[in-house]
Design a protein with these regions (language model features):
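Long protein-protein interaction modules used by eukaryotic assembly/scaffold proteins
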Residues: 71-131
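N-terminal low-complexity, intrinsically disordered segments
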Residues: 1-83, 88-96
Length: 131
């Protein structure tokens, strides 16, 4: 199954952004305003500053009881051996109940340039484990 993720700035909040997640015939939108504390620009800066990765940002999406939680993790990715390492971003999508029970959530792994271009990135669900 192919899936895609698209980063874009929100039209309603200049400090915010939206993430569109497509998986098969399912589509989910998450969005928020983290620019004051942990925005996308901070993710880029963290990627260049923290060599070991595992720096995470959590974001809730939903009214009242959150229906999704999104976690961004900066990780080091080996694509084709140690000589070809680059920064990657792991995106985990949780439902709130599963997250609270610490159930293993579905995981989406993607490799992006360190610039985190605000463009659609296509990946497959057979992405390598980057832990």
């Amino acid at each position: 199954m192919k899936a895609a993720i698209k980063f874009q700035y929100s039209g309603d909040d200049t400090d915010g952004y939206e993430i569109r997640i497509l998986a098969g015939d399912r589509e989910a939108w998450v969005g928020g305003s983290l620019a004051r504390n942990n925005g996308l620009g901070d993710l880029v800066r963290a990627a260049t500053a923290i060599a070991t990765g595992q720096w995470t940002v959590d974001m809730w999406h939903g009214e009242g009881t959150p229906c999704h939680r999104v976690r961004f993790s900066i990780v080091r990715v080996e694509s084709n051996g140690a000589a070809d390492q680059q920064w990657g971003v792991r995106v985990e999508v949780h439902d709130a109940a599963a997250f609270d029970r610490l159930v293993q959530p579905p995981r989406i792994d993607l490799i992006v340039p360190s610039a985190l271009a605000l463009a659609e990135i296509v990946y497959s669900d057979t992405a390598p484990d980057v832990t």
